[in-house]
Amino acid sequence: MVKYLVSKGCDISLIGDVAVQYACYGGHLEIIKYLVSQGADVRYDDDMNISISSMTGNIEIVKYLVTQGCDVRTGNNHAIRWACGNGHLEVVKYLMSQGADTSVYDNYVLCWAVTNKHFEIVKYLISQGTDIGILNNFLIKSASENGYIEMVKYFVYLGANFRDEDDCAIKMASKNGHIEVVKYLVSQGADFRAEDNFAVRWASRNGYFEVVYYLTSQGADFRADNDFALSWALINKHFKVVDYLLTLDIVF
């Protein structure tokens, strides 16, 4: 259809550059090659095409664009940032082999891979020397907050300080109801009573019965902060939590 439209007089010089972008979004390599053969500029809009193709994960288009002169580092390494954020490991590997820089914005690529649960990319970036020093504790806090138990274990193995910021990791895991992460962090020595029993208070407030039950079984003070746990469980209508806390003889 593209060739037909061109044969009928469509002016590549007017629309070709934008058309290449649409073809990159759609993953249409042959159309891209044809448009380029007709004079379209693959580097239009500050090499946006390689960022688009990295974002969508089309490795063959990414490779082709590089052969046509596209810069993998354009936009402060926008391409690899999007590839990491969207979980496209093969694109990440290729871009790094072409010199993409993973350290931009204080290793933003690693943060985004963790947040979006792309564990294989996380491991690959670290295996290639991405510096986790300034991010180490952020990474485990993010993994704990989002319930990514395998990542949490991995970062502990690497030496992450899961007790940073007054045991932020277990507080966030409890607040968001990630029982397996909570149990694991406790097994590693996290203080579930930190910040006036924040963990059990917020697990109660948000209605995570399993977490509340586990933390109280470990000795969390469910009466901390003037019975915050029961008050907020009641306000938020988490009646299973309310009933359980009442069995623990809370004075309300």
UniProtKB/Swiss-Prot annotation:
Disulfide pairs here are none
**What keywords are assigned to this protein?**
ANK repeat, Repeat
Q: What is this protein called?
A: Putative ankyrin repeat protein L62
Q: Which species?
A: Acanthamoeba polyphaga mimivirus
Q: Which SMART domains match?
A: ANK (SM00248)
Keyword Repeat present in the record's keywords: the answer is yes
Q: Which InterPro entries match?
A: Ankyrin_rpt, Ankyrin_rpt-contain_sf
- ANK repeats mapped onto the chain: 1-14, 15-44, 46-74, 75-104, 106-134, 136-164, 165-194, 196-224, 225-252
Pfam families from the xrefs? Ank, Ank_2
Q: Does the keyword Repeat apply?
A: yes
